[in-house]
Each structure stands twice: as C-alpha cells, then as structure tokens.
Regions:
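C-terminal, loop-rich substrate-recognition/catalytic regions characterized by aromatic stacking residues
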Residues: 40-244
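Phosphate/oxyanion-binding active-site loops and adjacent basic polyanion-contact surfaces
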Residues: 1-2, 54
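Catalytic His-Asp charge-relay segment
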Residues: 1, 23-25, 105, 183
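Catalytic cores of eukaryotic secretory-pathway lumenal/extracellular enzymes that build
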Residues: 19-48
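Active-site-adjacent alpha-helix of alpha/beta-hydrolase-fold enzymes
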Residues: 2-23
C-alpha cells in the first residue's frame, strides 16, 4: 500500500524529472522475507511464474542510475505487477491501471453481495466483545510469518463477523487496484473499530483473504481530530482496504 503511494507520489510530485520518470514499481506475491521466491505464500501457491531474480532487477537499476550503463531497464514500463489467480505478470505505465473499470458492489441483508442497489432492507446486527476481538488471520496487519493469503473460514464462522458473498462467478474477474469499503453503521457506544476484508472463496470452500482495512470510529474524518459517536446514530465510514 505504501509502495503504491510512494510510486504515485514520486511520479506526480517529485522535484526532479529523473525522480518522476525513472521510478520503478515491482509488486509480486511474496512476503517481506521471500522476495522473488516461488514458494507458497500463506495457503496459496502461485507457481513458477512468481519466481524472479530480484537482486538482478536491482543491479540493473543501479547500473543504469549510478554507472550510466544501458541495461535496458529504461525501455521497460515503470510498473510490473503479478496478477494472482491468473499467475502472470502485467506491465503498465501508471497506477491505478488506465483500463480499470470501477465497479460498485452493495451489501444486502441475508449476507448477499451484488451490483444491485439495495432497497429498504433491515440492518444487520452483531455484538462486539473487546475482551474477545476478532483475530487477524492472514492479511497485512500481522507478523511476517502469519501475513498473506490465508484461509479465513474459521474467522468467518464467528458470531461477531458479518459475511457478504456474491453468487458463484460464471467467469473470471480480475480485481486489480484500490479497494474502498463505504460502510453505513451505528454503534451502541461512543467509539469502536470497524474492519473489512476482501476474500476470494474457492470452489472447495476456502476463503482466502486478498486485502483488508481497519478504521477507528472516532478518527473517521481525520487522525488529527477525535469525533466520538452518538450511540444509535448512523454514520458513513470509509475503510481503505488497500490495493490488490
């Protein structure tokens, strides 16, 4: 997430033309400690295509920048990302990808997620016990060994987790880009945390986390100003689920 922000920030706001035009972004299906590997990450194996020589990539960049050697790296698009599921590499010149089709999905009662705008439906309720919070299982907010695409069926089975699912997909859908969860919710207390995850449900029932986000309610507008909730009042919360 921060890597995407740094890259787009350098492209648009860096003070020199070299910093704006020569920055590279490489995103693969790895953790902090197995960069370039084709070993399974979490509960998923991405195949041999995931393997690259990342040291060689860095040497090419440094040789070009520091030694003036034509390594061919300047002829390559600045962005190179790995598309999970398809398990192939894609290149681009800007982020988000220019061909991105932004699509809204809506939460419905009975655990339904669809592209149809909901009508007058009853709210979904759950009880939150801070003594027994929902655990992290995979994703990006846990330690290196426990991060990544893990199966979260055990987490989704909890009574304090709401799950919304689409119908089984009839065709492949590539989800590449920033994800935002716009949540309308109220609480019985003046402050709480909301979390959201985007999950890929496999035909065998595994629920593999793709990305996630968390928001403390009192900082919903700004981390610099506390705005406590009025219990029972519905608020709009924007949860940044990062990029996938």
């Amino acid at each position: 997430h921060e890597g995407f922000k740094q890259f787009t920030g350098w492209q648009s706001q860096a003070s020199t033309a070299d910093a704006r035009n020569l920055t590279k972004l490489l995103v693969g299906p790895w953790s902090h400690t197995n960069i370039g590997s084709d070993e399974p990450f979490g509960n998923v194996s991405f195949g041999s295509e995931a393997a690259i020589d990342h040291i060689d990539e860095q040497i090419k960049w440094y040789d070009a920048r520091l030694r003036g050697i034509d390594t061919g790296i300047d002829d390559e698009p600045p962005i190179r990302i790995f598309v999970m599921g398809e398990n192939s590499w894609k290149t681009a010149h800007s982020w988000p990808l220019p061909e991105t089709v932004y699509t809204n999905y809506y939460l419905h009662d009975h655990g339904i997620l669809s592209e149809h705008v909901p009508g007058n439906e009853s709210p979904d309720l759950y009880g939150y016990d801070p003594v027994n919070p929902v655990p992290s299982h995979g994703g990006q907010y846990v330690s290196i060994e426990c991060s990544g695409p893990f199966d979260r069926t055990d987490v989704e089975a909890r009574d304090d987790v709401l799950v919304y699912s689409t119908e089984p997909l009839e065709r492949d859908i590539e989800i590449t880009g920033p994800i935002l969860l716009k949540l309308y919710a109220s609480s019985s207390t003046k402050d709480t945390d909301f979390t959201g995850t985007l999950v890929d449900v496999y035909p065998d029932g595994k629920a593999i986390i793709l990305t996630e986000g968390i928001l403390r309610a009192r900082f919903r507008s700004s981390i610099e100003k506390e705005e406590f909730l009025v219990p029972g009042t519905v608020y709009e919360f924007d949860l940044d689920l990062w990029e996938t």
